[in-house]
């Protein structure tokens, strides 16, 4: 029935092939009257197994079109279809079948036979509609042959295919069938599950129709649209695709023919799969594409990625969002500052969108990011969908990189290949990383410093024990380069080599103490080894740069990354207190850190820190905040053996292999005669080698089989399985057997003061003071052992108690001991006191009657717990296994020592009750003695868990349990499933109460139980839910395993999460080369969201080096409900939006967003842990867990909750419909300040241009992030307080100066009123400043009411800058005189009096009288400009403002200029120099003599009745957010009523009465501006700008910015606009530090400084010593030197303003001037100079500006040299030569002396 139809028999097909254009897909549908028809895939494009038979098609047609060829025959027929995977056959009535691509993706495709004249009811007509009738696309046609009438009649019965036709030709000629309207347009839309498949056609099953919405594949024709048409990347004609809805996720696939292998290698030739959100065509696109395509893709990035011509065929398929969401998205940013608040907002905008690799995303039309990586299920994919759970990581290609190179003794060593470590770094590492930066075109700013720790002791460090540090050390830091652009990488490498060669001479060479030969140098000290180096000190040193979150920002760089280069292997001995301090500090900083080791990786876990606690115990730990990489640039050879241990001494011996063999002969093993089998021998050998000596001494024949010795057998059995979990400082395996024996004996038997310690530390009893001289028990003596340690109760050990070492100092205090321990003097002990080891005679009374003695180590000792309800005696055979091969102080500690951890606030009774109520059963089986102590006892290191626990808990939660390992075969099926299932395992983690002692409990402690020994399930879950603490109450943080196998989980027993804050991970077995089973536990908790799931970290190392990540905005960590209630203090406050903010369109949603935004800026992260839902559901009142959000999207209509965490502080922000935002702050309780435990740290630093090392001005260890008053900050955001009223400003600040630059040639002339005006350079720059101020004024924030009023008022009145030359105080005195004479009596406001207006028809005499004597008269004053004085003149800009304010028919400045020119032509006024026409600017004009009114004959116009209020307004004018302060004249006011108390310090020498009369002069103006005038941002972007109102053109003009939650990129754009305005007028906008130069060393120790001493001291040199001159200006010669060298005055010293003869006090809008020294800026902006009191000049590079202008990438072959760079070194070198050259400096001073003698005047 389905016979093959050969193409040679299809004459009609061949005849039609010539009429078909060169199409890749031809679908032939055969309609037969006598039977069904099938289809054969002829593959014309995508089926590689079938050849293309349409090579000779018509060239006039377009490719990629689909045509359905319907062949009509009276018998059996066969059609062909291309691009079909499951070509489904739709069987119609009368046996006619349409063979093609049916819209179905189900596997249930069955042939349905239809009888009658209609479709089977089970088939949805929409199925056919989607497949054929309702699609848009290319102008395709249907070719019909044979009986056209039959075809017409049959097709008319299928309305979903075609409903009407314009024309059907009769006969057997092919007929072109076209639809009459678009709604029934037949196109080439196909449905397929896989277009690449060659499956035969199948029919549609009615059961499969239900699943067609998601899984169907649609074949569409592609067109492109421009971005001006639509910004959407992909659009669909959804009117013709009814099963796809707006906003639905779809998949787009491309399939293309692979012609060659080279084509496969081309990325553009590969098939692609992308995801997009379905958006409907807009009307323009629908009209344009209705005949050409169904899908439109935006031109640009996506078009280049697809690499398909128009009208190509693509396949789309609807997808489920939850199945397609990406795990992690990486966004790269460059040359911009994106803070974490904007990252949160950007992430919110990206949710529910699709991205593809390489996509450039624009945010606010300013922030450009590039999608660099999309990860899903451990794989990097091309495209992905972003949902709420997708982690979005921001990586910066323009970061500040800090390279800290450890200069240790090993830096001069050679590696195994013979290369010196330093040369390996300089010749391999740095060139490689510079090439990486060049390839990806990064713009990093680089700082490189050497960190050296000099050992000044006389003994060798080899004499120190592991964990001990060198006491007598001195730390040095050499700053090689500081914030240098990568474009200078050649100079950087030269500096590195040079400084390394000089470091030895500088630090090892010291001047001899011999007075006879002072020039003799001796070598003192030596470089410390890397293992004893200052690793934590240098980390704190690097962290000082980002301690202040509100430091002055570099608007072109994002994130700070520290890379520590070390010659070691990642093992360091550190101080315990300093480790705690560093961990606490790093938890609150946004600092990434990498450790790059130049050696080969060792065979132990790294990085590894060793420290000794307060009990002199050695610990190993992993700092998870430190990433480690081992640099090896050589290709790996698996067949070559590489040494992994330090064999440097052996390599340098020069011995040959023969000599080594002769000298290093080893004896053969002498096997024992009693070996029965190999397994026994290996078992005994391992036991003797690896187990403690005491446990290995047990012999089988010493253990009898009587019932009393069952416990001994059990002990022997357990000892065989025990593994050592604490390694000693020296590896046991490297010692000989005799050495190990001696070591163990020394560690086991050691007498201390008042102590008697049993040989085997597993058996420790409490011994009376009288028996201290008795010999220790001999465990080989069975009778003695049975007598003293006969077991009466066996226990199941389930926990380990970890002491809190930080409390030991308090507990060893005699006063404390006497208070809390019952002291007896008799030597006899009775009862149960024999088994407790007492350290001193005063501890003779039993503290705990029956301490639990079994200790848990390794896989733990498995015994049974049998509760003795009536037995209160101490178990004489209490076993205390050792923790490992440590020191005797660690291994032999009694239960009494454990009690030293009790704080002063608790008693012994309460202490023991807290312990036993946590772990022991409170049922009848758990008995307590008269003191309230449970009969089950505790030891130093173990607490036992009863089999019967009722779950009662106490409120003291001081420990956390960390799951460890499970022994093979010891886990039941249910428990094994929990352990192997990560989600299940995590779900059972429950918090339990914690006593005051830190406790370690392994997971294997619980899971090693047999079926009849299981602990109560609730207790077990509790144990698995918490972890150990070290010095404070901590959170619960669930561990995550990367492997679910039993072996990997079992290895986990060697690791313990030491602190639930994830400070570090304590290692009990350090000899583990791989720790992959720890998984995410080794990742920093705060940075865990940076790493993709299931991706090896080694693949991410170059990302960390080249594009470091910013701190993620989310983290999955949160304390349990119990911990939140008991370990945290609650502080709360409420915030409500100020109603005045509504006039600026600020809502409560804006306030909430700003509150979250601000917390993200200072380091908070949004908590996404599932624990939050449990905590929230347990709250009283509102328990809506669905109100917990991660992003703030949409309208704020319902309840909104968000949890944020930083360090030890949690914030809960809750908004309800009342409009109030409630803030709950949970602050972790802390009884110990770690910063008080570490002494001050002194180090020495030598910056780039220093000649000697100097003491640092900052203590990097004690420098920490300050705490914030969040109530105050939230109120500031709500608009209730003025931030300037507080002493300490919390916000961002930046300072800019305007310096002269080269003037463009076309700027010197300008046409005004038809006249060509030629301006001087000074006039051009002054005009540029006016234009800049006008641009700033246009950004002023206006309320809604002000915006409406300004439409009807004068809007072009601008605040003017008062320019002056000469002395500032002379100028201010003139201004004050004018104020006192009441000549300035008009209201200085942009809103003038609209009731009294003049017009242009006014008579000149009347106008002259209004100008001079009117109510709002013009300011006519005497002005001085460069040695010339001009009496009774006014400024052109003031005249323009006066005309606009007072004339009703003048509204614009241009109209005012034209009218002013008319008045000047009429002779009303003239230019003082008769040089210019009337200009709007700082040009002086005078009233013509014939219009001047004699002031002496006119009565004062300022009467008490009319102008009192105006004068009061003028005198009280402030410059902060005041329209009255926006204009000239200079504001002066009484100080007493408005200024703060601090300003009283400015005039201490004046009397109280005269002080009250002083006026306050404000020299700057402030204005609240909107940096987003185009309203592209999602929030109000506000900023306060301060600019000078008084300016000397020979000085710097200042602009200061202050903001809190404004987007930095918008500020950068605004500054760019201002910079372009300045460049047009020969000015340059330069950013400089906000604070004065002398304060920077105490903030940034990396900053480079130069202190210059003048070779000529003008105060002492007879040639220049002039008392008259120095009485006027002490620093006259110094100032002249700076001016001649190109420096301009920036800030005067504060003492300059504190003049006794001044009648006013000078203030600025940004605060009181408090500069200690005068500061100058070089005209290049590269250097800042400060003049010291002793005459020295202090120089520093302007790094904030240098990093902005020198941001070009590393010069590569394809890129030319940067067009503009500033070389700061040239400036300092030239100036230094002048200062140190007698001839050059004398010439400068002689020129200054000549000027003084000529005019005897000194300018400021």
From Swiss-Prot:
Q: How is it placed in the membrane, per its record? A: Peripheral membrane protein
Report a single Gene Ontology molecular function.
GTPase activator activity
Q: Boundaries of each DEP domain copy?
A: 1414-1489
Q: Does the entry feature the keyword Ribonucleoprotein, yes or no?
A: no
**One Pfam family named in its UniProt record:** IML1
Which compartment or compartments is the protein found in?
A: Vacuole membrane
Q: Where is the composition biased (Basic and acidic residues)?
A: 14-27, 779-789, 879-892
Q: Which SUPFAM superfamilies match?
A: Winged helix' DNA-binding domain
Cited CDD domains:
DEP_DEPDC5-like
Q: Composition bias, kind Low complexity: at what positions?
A: 1503-1516
Show the InterPro entries listed in the entry: DEP_dom (IPR000591), DEPDC5_CTD (IPR045838), IML1 (IPR027244), IML1_N (IPR048255), WH-like_DNA-bd_sf (IPR036388), WH_DNA-bd_sf (IPR036390)
Region listing for Disordered, in residue ranges: 1-65, 169-204, 723-797, 866-892, 1501-1528
Q: Which keywords are on file for this protein? A: Membrane, Vacuole
Coarse class of the protein's main subcellular location: membrane
Q: Which PANTHER family does the entry link to? A: DEP DOMAIN CONTAINING PROTEIN 5, GATOR COMPLEX PROTEIN DEPDC5
What does the sequence similarity comment in the record state about its family? Belongs to the IML1 family.
Q: Please give the name of this protein.
A: Vacuolar membrane-associated protein IML1
Question: Whose protein is this, by species?
Answer: Candida glabrata (strain ATCC 2001 / BCRC 20586 / JCM 3761 / NBRC 0622 / NRRL Y-65 / CBS 138)
């Amino acid at each position: 029935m389905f016979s093959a139809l050969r193409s040679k028999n299809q004459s009609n097909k061949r005849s039609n092939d010539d009429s078909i254009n060169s199409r890749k897909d031809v679908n032939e549908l055969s309609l037969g009257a006598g039977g069904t028809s099938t289809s054969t895939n002829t593959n014309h494009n995508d089926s590689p197994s079938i050849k293309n038979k349409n090579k000779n098609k018509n060239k006039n047609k377009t490719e990629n079109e689909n045509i359905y060829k319907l062949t009509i025959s009276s018998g059996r027929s066969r059609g062909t279809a291309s691009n079909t995977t499951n070509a489904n056959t739709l069987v119609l009535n009368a046996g006619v079948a349409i063979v093609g691509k049916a819209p179905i993706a189900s596997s249930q495709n069955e042939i349905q036979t239809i009888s009658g004249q209609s479709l089977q009811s089970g088939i949805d007509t929409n199925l056919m509609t989607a497949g054929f009738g309702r699609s848009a696309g290319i102008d395709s046609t249907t070719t019909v042959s044979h009986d056209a009438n039959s075809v017409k009649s049959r097709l008319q019965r299928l309305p979903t295919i075609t409903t009407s036709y314009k024309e059907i030709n009769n006969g057997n000629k092919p007929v072109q069938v076209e639809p009459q309207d678009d709604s029934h347009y037949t196109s080439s839309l196909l449905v397929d599950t896989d277009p690449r498949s060659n499956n035969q056609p199948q029919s549609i099953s009615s059961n499969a129709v239900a699943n067609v919405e998601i899984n169907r594949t649609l074949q569409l024709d592609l067109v492109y649209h421009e971005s001006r048409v639509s910004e959407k990347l992909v659009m669909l004609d959804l009117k013709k695709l009814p099963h796809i809805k707006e906003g639905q996720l779809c998949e787009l696939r491309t399939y293309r023919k692979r012609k060659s292998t080279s084509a496969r290698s081309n990325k553009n030739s590969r098939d692609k799969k992308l995801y997009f959100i379905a958006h409907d065509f807009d009307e323009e696109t629908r009209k344009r594409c209705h005949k050409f395509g169904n899908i439109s893709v935006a031109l640009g990035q996506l078009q280049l990625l697809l690499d398909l011509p128009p009208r190509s065929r693509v396949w789309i398929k609807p997808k489920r969002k939850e199945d397609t969401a990406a795990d992690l998205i990486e966004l790269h940013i460059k040359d911009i500052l994106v803070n974490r608040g904007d990252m949160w907002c950007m992430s919110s905008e990206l949710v529910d969108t699709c991205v593809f690799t390489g996509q450039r995303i624009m945010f606010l039309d300013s922030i450009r990011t590039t999608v660099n990586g999309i990860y899903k299920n451990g794989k990097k994919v091309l495209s992905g969908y972003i949902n709420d759970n997708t982690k979005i990581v921001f990586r910066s290609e323009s970061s500040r990189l800090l390279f800290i190179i450890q200069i240790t003794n090993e830096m001069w060593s050679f590696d195994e290949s013979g290369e010196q470590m330093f040369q390996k770094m300089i010749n391999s590492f740095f060139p490689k990383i510079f090439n990486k930066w060049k390839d990806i075109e990064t713009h990093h700013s680089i700082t490189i410093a050497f960190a050296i720790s000099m050992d000044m002791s006389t003994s060798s460090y080899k004499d120190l024990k592991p964990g001990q540090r060198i006491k007598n050390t001195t730390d040095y830091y050499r700053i090689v380069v500081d914030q240098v652009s990568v474009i200078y990488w050649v100079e950087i490498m030269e500096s590195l080599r040079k400084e390394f060669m000089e470091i030895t001479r500088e630090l090892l060479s010291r001047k001899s103490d011999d007075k006879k030969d002072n020039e003799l140098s001796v070598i003192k000290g030596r470089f410390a080894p890397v293992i004893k180096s200052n690793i934590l000190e240098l980390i704190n040193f690097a962290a000082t740069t980002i301690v202040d979150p509100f430091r002055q920002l570099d608007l072109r760089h994002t994130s700070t990354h520290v890379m520590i280069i070390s010659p070691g292997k990642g093992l360091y001995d550190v101080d315990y207190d300093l480790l705690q301090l560093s961990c606490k500090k790093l938890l609150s900083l946004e600092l990434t850190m990498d450790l790059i080791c130049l050696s080969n990786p060792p065979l132990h876990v790294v990085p590894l820190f060793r420290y000794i606690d307060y009990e002199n115990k050695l610990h190993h730990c992993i700092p998870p905040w430190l990433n480690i990489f081992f640099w090896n640039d050589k290709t790996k050879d698996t067949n070559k053996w590489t040494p992994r241990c330090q064999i440097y001494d052996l390599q340098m011996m020069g011995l040959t292999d023969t000599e080594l063999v002769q000298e290093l002969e080893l004896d053969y093993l002498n096997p024992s005669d009693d070996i029965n089998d190999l397994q026994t021998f290996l078992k005994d050998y391992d036991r003797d080698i690896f187990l403690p000596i005491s446990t290995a001494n047990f012999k089988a024949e010493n253990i009898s089989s009587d019932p009393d010795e069952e416990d001994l057998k059990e002990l022997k059995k357990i000892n065989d399985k025990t593994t050592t979990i604490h390694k000693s400082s020296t590896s046991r395996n490297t010692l000989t057997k005799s050495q190990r024996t001696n070591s163990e004996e020394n560690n086991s038997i050691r007498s201390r003061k008042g102590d008697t310690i049993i040989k085997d530390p597993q058996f420790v009893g409490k011994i009376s003071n009288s028996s201290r001289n008795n010999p220790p028990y001999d465990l080989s003596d069975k009778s003695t052992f049975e007598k003293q340690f006969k077991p009466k109760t066996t226990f199941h050990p389930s926990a380990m108690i970890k002491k809190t070492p930080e409390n030991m100092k308090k507990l060893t205090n005699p006063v404390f001991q006497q208070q809390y321990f019952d002291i007896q003097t008799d030597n006899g002990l009775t009862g149960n006191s024999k088994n407790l080891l007492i350290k001193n005679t005063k501890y003779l009374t039993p503290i705990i009657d029956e301490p639990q003695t079994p200790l848990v180590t390794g896989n733990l000792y498995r015994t049974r717990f049998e509760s003795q309800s009536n037995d209160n005696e101490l178990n004489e055979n209490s076993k205390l296994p050792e923790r490992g091969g440590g020191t005797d102080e660690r291994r032999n500690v009694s239960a009494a020592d454990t009690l030293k951890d009790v704080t002063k606030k608790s008693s012994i009774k309460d202490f023991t009750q807290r312990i036993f109520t946590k772990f022991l059963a409170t049922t009848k089986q758990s008995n307590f003695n008269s003191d309230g102590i449970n009969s089950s006892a505790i030891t130093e290191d173990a607490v036992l868990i009863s089999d019967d626990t009722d779950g009662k808990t106490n409120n003291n939660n001081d420990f956390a349990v960390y799951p460890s390992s499970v022994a093979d075969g010891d886990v039941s099926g249910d428990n094994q499933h929990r352990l192997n299932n990560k989600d299940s395992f995590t779900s059972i983690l429950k918090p339990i109460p914690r006593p005051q002692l830190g406790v370690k409990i392994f997971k294997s402690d619980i899971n090693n139980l047999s079926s009849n020994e299981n602990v109560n399930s609730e207790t077990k879950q509790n144990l698995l839910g918490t972890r150990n603490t070290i010095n404070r109450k901590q959170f619960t943080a669930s561990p995550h395993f990367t492997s679910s196998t039993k072996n990997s989980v079992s290895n986990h027993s060697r690791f313990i999460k030491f602190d639930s804050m994830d400070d570090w991970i304590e290692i009990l077995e350090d000899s583990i080369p791989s720790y992959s089973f720890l998984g995410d536990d080794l990742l920093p908790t705060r940075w865990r969201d940076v790493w993709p799931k299931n991706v090896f970290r080694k693949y991410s190392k170059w990302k960390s080096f080249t594009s470091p990540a910013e701190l993620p905005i989310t983290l999955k960590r949160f304390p349990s409900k119990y911990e939140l209630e008991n370990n945290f203090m609650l502080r709360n406050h409420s915030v409500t939006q100020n109603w005045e903010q509504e006039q600026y369109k600020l809502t409560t949603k804006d306030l909430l967003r700003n509150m979250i935004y601000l917390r993200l800026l200072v380091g908070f992260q949004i908590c996404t842990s599932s624990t939050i839902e449990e905590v929230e559901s347990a709250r009283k009142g509102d328990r809506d867990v669905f109100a917990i959000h991660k992003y703030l999207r949409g309208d704020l209509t319902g309840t909104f909750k968000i949890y944020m965490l930083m360090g030890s502080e949690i914030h809960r922000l809750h908004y309800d419909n009342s409009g109030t935002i409630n803030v709950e702050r949970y602050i972790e309780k802390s009884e110990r300040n770690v910063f008080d435990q570490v002494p001050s740290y002194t180090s020495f630093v030598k910056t780039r241009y220093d000649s000697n090392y100097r003491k640092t001005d900052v203590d990097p260890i004690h420098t920490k992030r300050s705490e914030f008053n969040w109530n105050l900050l939230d109120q500031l955001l709500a608009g209730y307080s003025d931030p300037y009223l507080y002493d300490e400003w919390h916000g961002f600040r930046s300072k800019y100066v305007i310096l002269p630059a080269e003037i463009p040639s076309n700027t010197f002339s300008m046409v005004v009123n038809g006249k060509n005006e030629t301006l001087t350079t000074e006039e051009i720059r002054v005009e540029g400043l006016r234009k800049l101020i006008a641009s700033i004024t246009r950004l002023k924030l206006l309320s809604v009411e002000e915006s409406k009023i300004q439409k009807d008022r004068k809007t072009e009145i601008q605040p003017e800058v008062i320019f002056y030359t000469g002395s500032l105080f002379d100028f201010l005195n003139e201004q004050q005189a004018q104020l006192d004479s009441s000549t300035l009596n008009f209201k200085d406001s942009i809103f003038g009096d609209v009731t009294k207006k003049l017009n242009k028809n006014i008579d000149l005499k009347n106008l002259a009288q209004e100008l001079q004597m009117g109510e709002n008269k013009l300011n006519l004053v005497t002005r001085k400009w460069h040695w010339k004085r001009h009496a009774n003149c006014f400024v052109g800009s003031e005249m323009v403002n006066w005309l606009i304010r007072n004339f009703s028919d003048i509204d614009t400045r241009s109209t005012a200029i034209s009218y002013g020119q008319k008045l000047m032509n009429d002779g009303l006024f003239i230019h003082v120099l008769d040089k210019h026409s009337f200009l709007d600017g700082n040009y002086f004009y005078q009233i013509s003599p014939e219009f001047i009114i004699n002031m002496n004959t006119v009565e004062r116009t300022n009467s008490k009745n009319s102008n009192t209020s105006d004068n009061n307004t003028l005198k009280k004018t402030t410059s902060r957010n005041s329209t009255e302060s926006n204009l000239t004249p200079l504001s002066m006011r009484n100080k007493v009523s408005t200024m703060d108390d601090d300003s009283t310090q400015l005039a201490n020498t004046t009397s109280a009465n005269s002080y009250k009369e002083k006026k306050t002069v404000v020299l700057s103006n402030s204005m609240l501006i909107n940096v987003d005038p185009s309203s592209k941002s999602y929030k109000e972007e506000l900023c306060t700008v301060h600019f000078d109102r008084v300016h000397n053109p020979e000085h710097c003009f200042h602009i200061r910015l202050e903001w809190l939650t404004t987007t930095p990129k918008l500020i950068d754009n605004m500054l760019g606009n201002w910079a372009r305005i300045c460049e047009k007028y020969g000015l340059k906008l330069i950013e400089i530090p906000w604070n004065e130069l002398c304060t920077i060393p105490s903030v940034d120790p990396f900053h480079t400084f130069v202190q210059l001493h003048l070779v000529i001291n003008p105060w002492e040199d007879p040639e220049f010593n002039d008392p008259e001159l120095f009485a006027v200006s002490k620093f006259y010669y110094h100032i002249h030197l700076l001016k001649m060298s190109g420096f301009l005055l920036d800030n005067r010293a504060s003492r300059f303003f504190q003049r006794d003869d001044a009648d006013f006090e000078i203030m600025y809008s940004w605060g009181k001037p408090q500069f200690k020294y005068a500061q100058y800026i070089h005209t290049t902006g590269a250097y800042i100079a400060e003049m010291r009191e002793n005459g020295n000049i202090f120089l520093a590079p302007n790094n904030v500006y240098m990093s902005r202008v020198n941001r070009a990438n590393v010069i590569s072959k394809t890129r030319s040299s940067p067009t503009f760079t500033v070389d700061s070194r040239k400036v300092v070198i030239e100036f230094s030569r002048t200062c140190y050259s007698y001839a050059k400096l004398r010439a400068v001073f002689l020129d200054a002396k000549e000027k003084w003698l000529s005019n005897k005047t000194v300018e400021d």
